[in-house]
Amino acid sequence: MAAQVRVLRQRIRAAKSMKKITKAMELVATSRIAKAQEQVAASLPYSRAITEVLTALASNTRIDHPLLTPRERVRRAGVLLVTSDRGLAGGYSSNAIKTAESLLARLRADGKEPSLYVIGRKGVQYYRFRNRPMMACWTGFSEQPTFADAREVGETLIKAFTAGVDDGDGDPGPDGVFGVDELHIVSTEFKSLMTQVPVPKILGPMQIEDRPRSEGILPAYEFEPEAEALLDALLPKYINTRIYAALVESAASESASRRRAMKSATDNAEEMIEKYTREMNSARQAGITQEISEIVGGANALAASGSEV
């Protein structure tokens, strides 16, 4: 019995240590959710403003720009996948990868060759383990992304998109860049603390809704400098802003998923502690009962032997 009690004590100590760790990780994830939500809210006014300006530019001018004009024939499509750098986040990364795989299969079915770009160690490890080619990958900022991180990713994607696919031989262009005719992004939308959904979106070319001028939504503008110069300056910023918004929302989703996973682990540790404590108490009671029985049995034996004398 003593050995069993000792083993159960060790298990209780281990469960308590695990509970402290998972509780701390839950609290850290909770604080990061709030910070990521603040980043999302802070980026919205700029995102709305740049979208309105670009919509006005595209609606009031007839300029062909690589980031605005759909290609007649899409031969290669770039796909940016956002995953996490660390584990212990439930199904966050695996769900994003599953959504990306569905998109890749759909692109192939449409006769488009996918070019994969990956953010996050989990996604990079997944594709490297399977010997799947990646055009570029980035790690180290999935939990706390900055606009500089988004700009670095955006520059790579914009370079590939503006290069386009010159021919069908599958080789890179003269500058070593594999051009693409279309850009997609797979990131996780933050719906609530309990719900995060990975979704694919088109990143380029920018989709502009044609609105009748009679609606009066977009007034007449005079652009200084020229509209073409404004487009050259603003469209890359628009792509970078879209990527940054996806990164911060994915960061909030990752933290929410990790918080949920760590809360579940903390609850499981609490249940283990209660279970082992009950088992230890039962073992101790059984040991005490056995000792009392042995003492009573010995006393009775002594009494019986004394009466015989």
UniProtKB/Swiss-Prot annotation:
Belongs to the ATPase gamma chain family. CDD domains: F1-ATPase_gamma. GO terms for cellular component: plasma membrane; proton-transporting ATP synthase complex. It is a peripheral membrane protein. GO terms for molecular function: ATP binding; proton-transporting ATP synthase activity, rotational mechanism. The gene is atpG. Keywords: ATP synthesis, Cell membrane, CF(1), Hydrogen ion transport, Ion transport, Membrane, Transport. It is found in: Cell membrane. This is ATP synthase gamma chain. SUPFAM superfamilies: ATP synthase (F1-ATPase), gamma subunit. Produces ATP from ADP in the presence of a proton gradient across the membrane. The gamma chain is believed to be important in regulating ATPase activity and the flow of protons through the CF(0) complex. GO terms for biological process: proton motive force-driven plasma membrane ATP synthesis.
